[in-house]
Amino acid sequence: MGKIIGIDLGTTNSCVAIMEGNQVKVIENSEGARTTPSIIAYMDDNEVLVGAPAKRQSVTNPKNTLFAVKRLIGRRFEEKEVQKDIGLMPYAIIKADNGDAWVEAHGEKLAPPQVSAEVLRKMKKTAEDYLGEPVTEAVITVPAYFNDSQRQATKDAGRIAGLEVKRIINEPTAAALAFGLDKAEKGDRKIAVYDLGGGTFDVSIIEIADVDGEMQFEVLSTNGDTFLGGEDFDQRIIDYIIGEFKKEQGVDLSKDVLALQRLKEAAEKAKIELSSSQQTEINLPYITADASGPKHLNLKVTRAKLEALVEDLVERTIEPCRTAIKDAGVKVSDIDDVILVGGQTRMPKVQEKVKEFFGKEPRRDVNPDEAVAVGAAIQGQVLSGDRKDVLLLDVTPLSLGIETLGGVMTKMINKNTTIPTKHAQVYSTADDNQGAVTIKVFQGEREMAAGNKLLGEFNLEGIPPAPRGVPQIEVTFDIDANGILHVGAKDKATGKENKITIKANSGLSEAEIEKMVKDAEANAAEDHKLRELAESRNQGDALVHSTKKALTEYGDKLEAGEKEKIEAALKELEDVLKNASSDKAAIDAKVEAVATASQKLGEKMYADMQAQQAGAAGAAGAAAEGASAQGGAQPPDDVVDADFKEVKKD
């Protein structure tokens, strides 16, 4: 069997590594570099350039040179982050037929996984050239905060590149593997991995434990921002240069794609230089021209100026750190080591901020560009069975659930649950004789489904006619070791089932995730109220249904006045339920009124049952008491009413 290679598919740079025995080897590409720019150029003669050659020609071919495509992978075109990038990128970002964000080169529409596959293909070839044999299997890394569709899209990119993706592994976890196996320290320790890359930011709290000679890496929590990275730092410098040039020369460079490409290159170079120097000079002759002739750009930028430009970006990384510490159930003082991953962590201001938050110097003995690929290669060796002394326990970054009656988000799997994991729950129908149900799958932390991200939906049809609450529909959530979700629904009576893997039909952006989490905290009280209101409405609906049914069967045994009293109370309850602005107190009062008015009806039902089932008086009495208290029969305890709709056949 061939080797399983480890690939760090980065926003800005990518890297490939393999294990040789217990030694790791980061492989140099055909240009002799250990990292490859994640840049792809589509040439006039249909040639595709990847890496340094693509980067070198980008200034003369800006519209067909694609970079930072990872920021678009698994995302919808409408997302505000995608819309923001449209105005910044020299290449075209377009809307695909399915609503995804795609790109365009030479008039050809390209899906982000298709473009990323070119980089993966280069990584595959780099490994094959070194090993002298074909490579077909890989472990590919993704940001820990990547959602389901982004992971699926990354897996698709691997398949397009001719690789069987044995595992999708989180970048901070991979870096922890590289760090843990490289160090001789014994005993349990907790580490924080602060990963600020080209396009994404992640922080994970990981416990490394020695269990019977086996190193166990357990992720305690993860958090992050999938739209924050070195590209944003570069953009701040570009915006600053454009502003200064406009003040001096009166020319707006933001409309000139050729100039923008040169500015991007210069901004990245200046940023890197300012990590070791206090000042740098950006010198771009013939940057543009107007009626008066050519214009030259010459600008001095100090480290202090750069730090002022990006201060809020650095600050944005701290809140996820705070959340990760809280979710892990640890204190900052419990962290033994802080690992920095990603090229952007070389910036002194970033290191200073990390030291300030964690109260200790971050480790400098981990290569921020290579650690992730090294960890992926180690995981590849574990999966191939060549390494038995490592156990990796990763987590899912966000809660997953389905929408149930009243628009409530019923969580099936909570965030930071160790994966792989599986959870099943029995639900029922909301209407009599409902022939089909629609299962809507959501991801997020809000109590109401509308506040979360809809990942996908599917139908389970052919449910035999039955009263509401009788059919038993088992919904199963299964997250595999790649963090990819599989959902199934099964009618327990007929055995009919339907399963889906959530496909990359929608992208869950970090801004949305952060908004969900922050909103969930800020609006916890409001969410709780909405949930209670939904529960009161559900109780009211159930009571109307069961009381009407009881009236049909036993109403003729009541005096006319009693029956009218119940019908009047029912009418008032129905009116208050129909009114969208009714609050919980109003609904509860009418529910109580119906329950009180129905006491005589309950007694008649009780007497009738006693007469019919004299032999089973005890059992019948218990059932009738339940009916009089609740206004009707209730489904079993383990059955939750779900807000399913009937799917009409054309």
UniProtKB/Swiss-Prot annotation:
Induction: By stress conditions e.g. heat shock. Pfam families: HSP70. One of its GO terms (molecular function) is ATP-dependent protein folding chaperone. CDD domains: ASKHA_NBD_HSP70_DnaK-like (cd10234). Residues 611-634 have a biased composition (Low complexity). Residues 611-650 are annotated as: Disordered. The keyword Calcium does not apply. Keywords: ATP-binding, Chaperone, Nucleotide-binding, Phosphoprotein, Stress response. The modification Phosphothreonine is found at residue 200. Coiled coil: none annotated. InterPro entries: ATPase_NBD, Chaperone_DnaK, Heat_shock_70_CS, HSP70_C_sf, HSP70_peptide-bd_sf, Hsp_70_fam. HAMAP family: DnaK. Belongs to the heat shock protein 70 family. NCBIfam families: PRK00290.1 (NF001413), PRK05183.1 (NF003520), prok_dnaK (TIGR02350). Acts as a chaperone. This is Chaperone protein DnaK. It comes from Burkholderia pseudomallei (strain 1710b). The gene is dnaK.
